[in-house]
Structure formats: C-alpha cells, structure tokens
Amino acid sequence: MKFVLETVSKCSGRLGSLSGVDRLASSAKFQTPTLVLHTKGGSVPHLSKEVLHYLTGAEPQLMQYSLNGTVHMEEAVRGCGDGLSGFVAQKESVSLLVLRDPAEPCQPGYHEKDVVPVFGRSGRKNFTAESYMSLVEAFRPDVYVPLFDGDTDGGSSKKREQRSQERTETFVEQCLEVHRKSEKLKGASVLGPIVGGYNKKLREKSVQFVERLKDDFAGYFIAGLHSYGSSASEVKEAPLLDIVSSVCQQLPLEKPKFLFGAFTPQLVLELVVRGVDIFDTSYPYLKTQQNRALNFSFDTSDSNVVARKNELDLTDACWAEDFTGFVDGCQCLACTKHTKAYTHHLYNTREMLAPILLMIHNLHHYFEFFKAIRRHVAQDTVGELIAHINKHVVLPVTDGVVKEPGKSLDGVELKESASVQVEAKRVKV
C-alpha cells in the first residue's frame, strides 16, 4: 500500500491518495480523507453485493473486516484457500483486517497474560500473537493491524493505560517477527497501532516504538480512545482531539493515519483538521439500526440549515403521509424511488426492505459528505463546513434506546392510514 500526500492546507487538514495494492490493478486509487466500508460477517450490513455495486459504481472499495465478526469463519476460509476476500466474494476490493468491530461495544476486562480476548458469535476466544498471525496467514488481508491491547477509553485507570502500551509493544514485535518470515503475507501492508489511552506520555512512548520499526509500517492505526459502538458518538471531544492532535504531530507526514469509530460528523471534521486520513462507515450503520435517515446538510450555501434536523426517525408517525424522499435533492436509490411514508409503513410491518432502503440512503449521504470534505480541504474551508453543520437542529438520541418498529417511544401502537396502504401497493420494490 502506497500513500501519496498531495496537499497540506493551513487550517483544514490534508489531501492524499492510497494505491499500490499488489494484487489489484494499478488503477485502484482512493482519494483521502476517505472511508473504509464497515462489514459484518464479510458483508456490508443489509446490502447484497449487487446493491453495494449499484451504490458505489462497482469500483474497488476499501473493505474493513473485524476479527470478532469473522473469527467464526477461520476454518472455512482455510479450506477455501483463497483468503478472506475470495471467501466473501470481494476479491476486487482492498481488504483491511482489524481486531474490533467499531459498531459493537467492547466487553472490558479479561486481560490475561500474553493474550487478547476477542468476542465472536461463539463467545470469547483468546488470541496469542502466534495464533493471531496463523489466522492472518489464512485470511491474507491486503492491510492488517497486528495484535494489540487497545482496551482503554476516557475512564481507564493509569495502570490500565500503561498495561495497554506495554502489552502492545510485546504483541507487535512478536507479530512482525512472523510477518517478516511469512511467504503468504509478502504483499500485505501493516499498520502500526498507537495506544496509551488518554495519557500523553504513554502515547508518546507508543509513537516512539512504532517509529523505531517504521520500515515495517505502511501507516498508523490510532486506537484506545473509546469503547466502540455508540460510545464514539458520545465521547468528550476536547480530550480526544487533544490526544489525536498530539499523536498526529509526532507521526511522519508521509504515512496515512487511520481512526475508526462512529464519530459524529462534527467530530469527523475536527479529526480531519488534525490530520486523520481514513475513517469507517460504522456511523451510518448505527443510524440505520436506530431507524434514522441522515439529513445533515454539507452544502454551506443552504440558508435553511437552522431549521433542519440532522437526522429523521422514520418510525415516527409524523411521516405516515409524507410522500417525498428522505432528503430533498438526494439522488440515492431510496430517495428517488421511495418515500418517507412507504418506509414508515415498512417499519410498521417489520419488512426487511426498511433497513435496506435506509442503509442505501445513509451510506450514499455519508459518501457525499466525504466528497464535500475533500472539496473543503482543497479550498482550506473546513472551518466553514464545521460552523454550517453545527447550526442543525439535533434530534435527541433517546438515551440509546432503539425504538421498536411500529411503536412510538412510549410504546403506543402506530396505525397506518389508508393512504399509506395505497402507497405501499403502488410503489414497486
């Protein structure tokens, strides 16, 4: 994997490009800041491969595979003999293997000596550096993060942060020893994990460690800042930005920085300003799971933004007779072919199509958001975009409670109107 730094703006972050994955055509190139597609069990949640290709234009994508979401596939992938990308029929895309699913909350604890716990479908499995690298050789990812201890967040003790940093150094050295000798991983790129919780001195030690081994790393993976899942959207911004800013300033400019989690759009922009290059799509996925359509505006010429909600709850009865698309002007399949009323009906009747349509819209909206980010970085106007997005009316998170389809937040049954039933019959799925 090769990273080319193209532009460093004064106040808006940087532009670059990723390319050089050995097994793909030389035309596979990704402009940064960019997104890695979050997956579960090897697939983008709710979307078939064909729908995903319709959404992305069948171009190569950066695909993120988490260990806790794929560990149950290990024996099957070994039997396939074609690596994880071949097994899940995504050979045309770049595969990135990480330890944790950023959309799933981490289970704290279980810090046994010389192992890292991973919680998959079959429960907890402890990985040593040796067993982890054996799995990596079977999966043969294009890019991967070595085994590390990133189990820290804003509430971690100093002792836990220190153990995280010390254990990570040991794991990484053991993994690199295997990597250097492996014939199966000759074309794979490795990301250096930066850990240490919210302790600047430990983060500095972590940076110094990966810099001693800089020839082994194609980029850097900043971890241990939240507990994944919705915690990334609720994290205290100031301490996180302080740590990320400090880390990015210490790392070399010429290599990409990865930071995953379901961060709010505002926090994503602040992280871009501080030098983070690559994020993931766990945020639109979690919004889909909450039955919400992304609605925030990234067009700074939109004067109606102060009256605009950042997202729409499509199970809310107020949409029962709204026969317009999710977002005015959106050109995604869901918005051009379907309506809020129809999708509201689908949620009421618990149809599988409801989250499919919502995921199509949310991914499209998020990809368009990142196109806007790249434009603003090029013009050095990300600050204007941050101010614009901060003007939105923020829809309450409802204390993390996901509303049951067909009911309001207080549990009252939502009944369909006759017009919705007519619309449901009229629309072709």
UniProtKB/Swiss-Prot annotation:
<comment type="subunit">
    <text>Heterodimer of a catalytic subunit and an accessory subunit.</text>
</comment>
<comment type="similarity">
    <text>Belongs to the queuine tRNA-ribosyltransferase family. QTRT2 subfamily.</text>
</comment>
<keyword id="KW-0479">Metal-binding</keyword>
<feature type="binding site">
    <location>
        <position position="361"/>
    </location>
    <ligand>
        <name>Zn(2+)</name>
    </ligand>
</feature>
<dbReference type="GO" id="GO:0101030">
    <property type="term" value="P:tRNA-guanine transglycosylation"/>
</dbReference>
<dbReference type="InterPro" id="IPR028592">
    <property type="entry name" value="QTRTD1"/>
</dbReference>
<feature type="binding site">
    <location>
        <position position="330"/>
    </location>
    <ligand>
        <name>Zn(2+)</name>
    </ligand>
</feature>
<dbReference type="GO" id="GO:0008479">
    <property type="term" value="F:tRNA-guanosine(34) queuine transglycosylase activity"/>
</dbReference>
<protein>
    <recommendedName>
        <fullName>Queuine tRNA-ribosyltransferase accessory subunit 2</fullName>
    </recommendedName>
</protein>
<dbReference type="GO" id="GO:0005737">
    <property type="term" value="C:cytoplasm"/>
</dbReference>
<feature type="binding site">
    <location>
        <position position="332"/>
    </location>
    <ligand>
        <name>Zn(2+)</name>
    </ligand>
</feature>
<keyword id="KW-0963">Cytoplasm</keyword>
<dbReference type="InterPro" id="IPR036511">
    <property type="entry name" value="TGT-like_sf"/>
</dbReference>
<comment type="function">
    <text>Non-catalytic subunit of the queuine tRNA-ribosyltransferase (TGT) that catalyzes the base-exchange of a guanine (G) residue with queuine (Q) at position 34 (anticodon wobble position) in tRNAs with GU(N) anticodons (tRNA-Asp, -Asn, -His and -Tyr), resulting in the hypermodified nucleoside queuosine (7-(((4,5-cis-dihydroxy-2-cyclopenten-1-yl)amino)methyl)-7-deazaguanosine).</text>
</comment>
<dbReference type="Pfam" id="PF01702">
    <property type="entry name" value="TGT"/>
</dbReference>
<dbReference type="InterPro" id="IPR050852">
    <property type="entry name" value="Queuine_tRNA-ribosyltrfase"/>
</dbReference>
<dbReference type="InterPro" id="IPR002616">
    <property type="entry name" value="tRNA_ribo_trans-like"/>
</dbReference>
<feature type="binding site">
    <location>
        <position position="335"/>
    </location>
    <ligand>
        <name>Zn(2+)</name>
    </ligand>
</feature>
<keyword id="KW-0862">Zinc</keyword>
<keyword id="KW-0819">tRNA processing</keyword>
<dbReference type="GO" id="GO:0046872">
    <property type="term" value="F:metal ion binding"/>
</dbReference>
